[in-house]
Every structure is written in structure tokens, then in C-alpha cells.
Amino acid sequence: MTNPKADLLAHLESMAARYQDRWTLSACGVTVGRRSIPALLDKNSNSPGANTASALLISGLSGSADDVALARRALDSTPSDDAGPGNHISLSAIPDCNPDGLRDLSTGYPPIGGFFYNAEEPEKRYLWRWICFLAPTLILELRSGEAVSWQSNEAGSNLASALARSGGRVENESLLDSLGSGSPDGLGPIPGLRLTSPPESLDDELGKLWKLLSEQPGLREASPARQVLEARSARSHLEVAHILASVYGYQLDPVNYTQGVGISGRLQLYELSKTGESPASGIVDLVEPYVSGSTPMFGERVGGANLAGLIWGRELSAATGDPRYSDLIVAVANRYQPGVDGGAPPPCDPDFRTEDMFMAGAMLGRAFGITGETRYLDLLVGFITGGNIQQESGLFWHCRPANFYWSRGNGFAAMGLTETLTYLPENYPGRDTVAAMYRKLMDGLVKIQDPSGMLSQVLDMPGSYQELTATCMLGYSIARGLRRGWLGPSYQAPLDLAWRGVSQRVDDEGNVVDGCASTGVQATLNEYLDRPAVFGFDDRTGGMALWFALEMHRHQG
């Protein structure tokens, strides 16, 4: 055999092509050398209510080529009815967790901070998060050695006992050890076994494990981590919305869309559910200093993100009967002026950034809805169709000088097109062009949606982290499109997948998983890959998740 690490990707591609009904080729991370970490993913691994247990095979943490060769041997035997796990177990694999092999990644878990920009060991962060949210029934680590040995983590001790081959516990702070106790990433533990074996003993040892799992259904129960994820998925759209609305939308300093979307979401939720106390009076108190002028609403430099901080104006007027709040939207829309020589309308960035597609779409569209004046739509349609940053794939560059497929940048484009279509009359000039751009983008994003339902931080970089805000924005845009008849029923499955991924990444306290931090235009691909991912409270992500939940309720109830 050639170096088992060198041609691994081609080997996995071949296996995925040969067994298309079983596997898909994916990626679970990016190395410090900017190589994707390939993963062979069983197509049932993310399926709700699957009748099979899920096992994840991992190897190569130390960088050892012998370990990777052992994992390849295990995978090659899997399709065989005699040696494979059979129909009761879906098997996914990360055969080489450490493709660069620059450092030994065997210990040092859980990784603390630096998601996913750690300069020395980003692989640990990627592996940790990806495995936690795959949440298999069992993790099986393979290591090459001269003698057979089985070890387990705390959660896998019952499996080790049933095998009657226990060699004790794996070492502290190893990946298996840290995943096997407590509440990794706010979920639950995942049982883990480590098999150390010479190649000639591998098939027999694996056969014992597969036979045991086949004969004892109790050992195939969902891991505690998976149980937490499924419980999150089982919540209704309004349940998730109420959780998010209990946390987000209580600040307006600074005046920015990251605050405004949450405030808007709280008002929308009350109108949809009519449960509890209306948030209107509290929001009136929150915004009054700005509305009255006692507190300056904006600083010296005012961009679209600041103007969209007032996105709640029409909803608050509807809730209170006070027209001042709708008037705020009209006032900020009047700040948009025609561009010069085909340029973007100030205060939009002259480079046609996708952020402005959402900000302008939201505020100019609402201004038209309030006043009926088509001059707002003229500005909006000219801007949306004049940027020329949508590519043949349907995806958008971040802006004209930044030819990078940033995930939230495409989310902003999706939201901008969606908001624009929401307000454009059916016969309005340019509507067909906007609708075609919208459908082309939806097609492009759905094609690259991860099996988890998520979009990656950099859309054309397999293994970049699964980013929550962009996935919420995609889901919102699809749900609105299905509800309004802009999209056909084939989009329901990608929408359901997006909701599943998002709902699993919002806990019962409204904490979120991996929302990209505030990001301006970056100069290099690496800078987009290295944008920090927020885990916990994040008003930007929480507000978008709230809007997504509300649109899902409107669409599906």
C-alpha cells in the first residue's frame, strides 16, 4: 500500500461513489495547514428517528500512518455482511483526524477557547464540536499495536464489560475521555471504546463488537448527547421562539440590526401567540430616549447596520397606535440617496456589500409598505440588481473586491432578496430579475447544505465550521418563499433539515452554537476562516434564530 494518508481522500471518494446509498463524503474540520479533514458520513447518521445505532470510527490523532491504515482496513471490510456492522449500525468515519501530522492531537481535551482560529491546534476544536453534534451512539477509536487491547471511557464502560475484554480506561484528557463524561458542549456524554490491534486481528475484534451490538439492543440506545439533541428538535417552533424571546431583544445600545431584529422578533411573537404579557410597554420604555432625542440615536458614522436597528418601528406602532415608530423607518429610509453613475445608494458601501442587501431591503421595503411611495422601491431594486456580485453558482461574493463566499454574506443576500420580494408588487419593474436572483441563490445554497442542515463558514471550504446565523437566514428565506409560493415543494426537505440543525444548536436558555462574530470585509480566505465562533449568548445569532422560528411557525404552524 502507498502511504495510507497520502491517497486517503481519493479512497474515500471511491467508497462514497461505490456505496452511494450508504455514504456521503463530508469534512469535519480544517487543519492548521488549511487542509480539509475528510469524513465518510453514513446517510442515516443525522436522520430523526432512525432505527439504527450510529457508530463513529476515528483514527490517526497522533499522526500515525499505521493508525490510518488500520482505519482504512476497517472501512474496507464494512460493506461485507460477514465482517461489517450489519443493518443495525450506521457507520461513519474520520479515518485521519490529523492529516498534517504536525502535532500529536491525542490529548488536551476539551479544547478551551480559540474556536476555530487557534493558531497551533485548530483541528482539536473542529473535531470536538463536530463529534459532539454528530452525537453518535458509540465512538470507536482505532490504534495500531502489537497486541489486542480494548479500553473505554466512562460512558462506554458497559460496552467494555459486555465485550469482556476491558483493558481499563482511556487516559485522562484524551478525546474519548473528555467526550465520555459530564456535559460536553452542553449536551451529554458519548460512549467510547478504543481498540488497539495488529492488522491481522482487526476483523475478528471488530466482528465481536458488531455481533455484540447486534444481539443486545440495549447497547444500541441513543447516547445521552443524542438524546439532548433530539429533545431540542422536538420543541415546537413557538417553543424555541419563546426561549429566544426571553433572552434577546432587550437592548438598543448600540442602535444596530443585531439589537433591532430581536426587538422586532419579540413583538412579532406576541402577535402570533397572544400568550403572556405584551412586550410593547417595555420596548417603548427602552426606545423612548432615542425616539425623544434625549439620547443620540446614531454616532457620527451611520451605516445600514445602524439604520436597520430600527427595523421594529412598524410593529411597535401597530402594537401601541403611536405612529412615531413607523415614522422612524421612513426617516431612515430617506437617508438613502441615488447612487452616482450606477453606484450603490449612500449610505450603502460603494463596493456593494451583501450586508447592505439586507439592511436596504428591510428598511426601504418597509418604508414603501408604510407610505406607498415607489421611490423607495426604485432605489432598492436598482441596488439589488446592480451589484453584479452573484456568480454562476448562485452564490455571492462578499462584495466586489472580496471574491470570497462568506456564509453570512450569502445569508445577508438571501435575506435582502427575500425582504425585497416581500414588498415588491407582482407587476413591479425588475421583480422578475430579483425573483430569478433569489431562486438562483436558494438553489446554490441548498446544493452545498451540510447533511446536518447547516451552512459552513466559508461555503467553498469543506470542513469550515457550521455557522448558525447563515443557516437561520437561509431557513427564513426558504420558509418565506414556500409560504408565498416563490419556491416549489422540493424545498421543504432542505428547510426541515435547516430547522433541525438550528433547533439543535439553541439550548433551553437561548444560548447558541457557533455564530460568526462581527465581520467586515476581509482581505484573505484565511481571515474568513479565522473569524471567531460565538458559543453562548449572541444577540446577532439569537435574533436571526428568532425570526427563523417565527417564519417556520407561519409556514407550518
Where is each model-derived feature located?
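Oxyanion-binding "anion nests"
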Residues: L202, T418-D460
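Active-site/substrate-binding loop(s) of hydrolase catalytic cores
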Residues: T31-V32, G49-S174, G180-L187
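Inter-helical turn/loop segments and adjacent helix faces that build the functional surface
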Residues: A367-R375, T420-D432, G481-P489
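Short beta-strand-to-loop junctions in surface cap/lid or active-site-entrance loops
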Residues: P38-N51
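CBM-like carbohydrate-recognition segments
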Residues: L176-L179, V228-V240, G249-G260, L272-S278, ...
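Extended ligand-binding groove/face enriched in aromatic
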Residues: S292-P401, Y405
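Carbohydrate-binding/catalytic loop surfaces
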Residues: I243-V247, S264-L267, L307-A319, P346-M359, ...
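Short glycine- and acidic-rich boundary segments immediately preceding or forming the N-terminal edge
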Residues: M1-P38
